[in-house]
Amino acid sequence: MAARWSEKNPDLKGAALEDAMQKEPWDPSVKGLTSVPQVLAMMSDKLDWTQQLGEAFLAQPDDIQNAIQVLRARADEAGNLKSNKEQNVRRVAATPSPGYAGPPEYIVIEPVEPDYVYVPVYDPVVVYGADYWPPAYVPFFWYPRWWTVGPVIGFGAAAFVGPALWYHYNWGNRGYAAVQTNTALYSRFNRVNVTGGGQFQN
């Protein structure tokens, strides 16, 4: 439903999008995704994948997060993960956490401009290699209408997400708080009163 709404309202952004979201009964996480319609469209087109990913994250969050780092490392080793005008790629040291054994450092990917996100489009077999997936989980290559054959990793137009993405992933301290929440941005987009002074909260 949200994906169809987004397709019908492609020009709504910023404050206008915030206002429109107040009329919809969706979960705040769904409302936030309307700022990145390309991601929302892929999740809608591949509902079985979206459900499986959600269930896997609920049951095995550490395994999912480790898998992300393994794939980023593979892309980096193949020369397919680099900083550019859309994103910054850097490594951060991990904070030791009781009861959790993770890698000593993490690969972090951040937008060059904090309020804008460029959603990457790529063939996972090309970026990660032809043997990275288990036989039971053959990868798929989802691409938007504008996609044409070009660089290994392509990017669409910038999506303004300043007020909509209120979560920040804390890779360096996963054992204690994987996700931090910016209460001011959450409150602004969802018109609710959450204390916290506008800072990222654990």
PLM features: residue spans?
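Mature extracellular/secreted ectodomains of secretory-pathway proteins
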Residues: 1-99
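Low-complexity, repeat-rich tail regions
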Residues: 60-202
